[in-house]
């Protein structure tokens, strides 16, 4: 096994420590909301299996602890990503193990098309925007992230914080910009769709994005295949195309001098969804989990993890103040999420052609 650099291990340790502190703070913050919920009389072995519920992503640790407190149901942590979760569901489709699953929006369409999910319309179903739920209830959004610029201001060497997609093409930012590979990372693809839509493209015309990426090559961008969060914190990457919740976590949890920017030309918001697994062995418990993540308490926990709750739940002034103003988020335009999913492979192929 390759040894990891000491600085990376130290960074990981600090992230874990801050994560624990954030989880405890979030649970304390929501104590009043949870106090009004009555736990069910559950046996110690009463569980609901969730695929792709990792404790360090979106603070699932706090959400799962709150589910246990409110319902008596234990949800084990699971570190799969969306693709791995779907592969596991396919392998187990004759004898399912999972009860619920958490997925990126593109993967939700795939899971539904493959017959891996069953219909369930949870409590607060009517609060979910129509475009962010399957009409039959096979999946529904629980929160979203908005694509923009995660900027480490200390690493800009005195240069101004970029405010637009056009700014990133300026030569002063040479060697400072990174985006995840859009052919292998969904957030990279989401960033490509964001710039394409902002510059007048569509799902039938990716040329604006392809031209923008071609021009960006003059600035020698860094293109990681996996998350680059720690590299932004260290200053190695001053500007990363990423979700807002990562930037807020860096600023408020890891206390980095990071700013999140929604570009002037516009961007997109990307939902993350959940659904009930077809043939779920503990479907009743799975339904209770799905009800909870959409409850006021559950939605406030997502906000405490710097995600945008799907429901318009009331937030504390402290929570609200940590997000950019609503006027900035108005630049995050809606997209057809079915088309977002359907056109992912086509964009990847077109992007690769421009790189050779």
Regions found by a protein language model. Give the residues of each.
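A bilobed periplasmic-binding-protein/Venus flytrap-type ligand-binding module shared by bacterial periplasmic
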Residues: 148-155, 193-198, 270-283, 301-302
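Mature extracytoplasmic/periplasmic domains
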Residues: 277-334
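Extracellular/periplasmic bilobal clamshell ligand-binding domains
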Residues: 319-356
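Periplasmic-binding protein-like
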Residues: 127-130, 145, 210-215, 221-222, ...
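A ligand-binding cleft/hinge motif common to bilobed small-molecule-binding domains
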Residues: 106-110, 233, 238-257
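Short beta-strand->loop
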Residues: 117-126, 139-140, 166-169, 238-239, ...
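Extracytoplasmic ligand-binding site segments that recognize negatively charged/polar headgroups
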Residues: 53-61, 97-236
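Early extracytoplasmic/lumenal segment of secretory-pathway proteins
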Residues: 44-110
């Amino acid at each position: 096994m390759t040894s990891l650099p000491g600085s990376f291990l130290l960074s990981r340790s600090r992230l874990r420590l801050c994560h624990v502190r954030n989880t405890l703070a979030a649970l304390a913050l929501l104590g009043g909301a949870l106090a009004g919920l009555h736990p069910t009389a559950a046996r110690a072995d009463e569980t609901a299996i969730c695929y792709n519920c990792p404790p360090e992503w979106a603070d699932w640790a706090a959400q799962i602890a709150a589910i246990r407190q409110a319902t008596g149901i234990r949800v084990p942590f699971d570190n799969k990503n969306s693709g791995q979760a779907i592969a596991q569901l396919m392998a187990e489709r004759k004898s399912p193990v999972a009860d619920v699953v958490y997925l990126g929006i593109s993967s939700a369409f795939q899971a539904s098309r493959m017959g891996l999910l069953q219909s369930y319309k949870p409590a607060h179903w009517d609060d979910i925007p129509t475009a962010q739920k399957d009409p039959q209830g096979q999946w529904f959004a629980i929160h979203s992230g908005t694509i923009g610029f995660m900027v480490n201001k200390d690493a800009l060497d005195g240069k101004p914080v970029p405010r637009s997609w056009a700014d990133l093409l300026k030569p002063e930012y040479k060697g400072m910009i990174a985006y995840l590979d859009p052919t292998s990372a969904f957030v990279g693809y989401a960033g490509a769709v964001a710039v394409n839509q902002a510059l007048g493209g569509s799902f039938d015309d990716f040329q604006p994005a392809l031209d923008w990426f071609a021009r960006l090559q003059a600035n020698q961008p860094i293109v990681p295949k996996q998350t680059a969060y720690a590299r932004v914190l260290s200053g190695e990457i001053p500007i990363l195309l990423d979700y807002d919740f990562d930037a807020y976590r860096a600023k408020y949890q890891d206390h980095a001098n990071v700013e999140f920017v929604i570009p002037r030309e516009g961007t997109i918001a990307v939902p993350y969804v959940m659904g009930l697994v077809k043939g779920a062995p503990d479907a009743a418990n799975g339904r209770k989990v799905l009800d909870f993540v959409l409850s006021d308490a559950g939605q406030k926990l997502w906000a405490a993890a710097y995600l945008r709750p799907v429901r318009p739940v009331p937030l504390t002034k402290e929570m609200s103040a940590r997000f950019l103003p609503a006027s900035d988020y108005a630049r995050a335009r809606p997209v057809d999420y079915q088309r977002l999913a359907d056109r992912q492979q086509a964009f990847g192929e077109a992007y690769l052609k421009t790189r050779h």
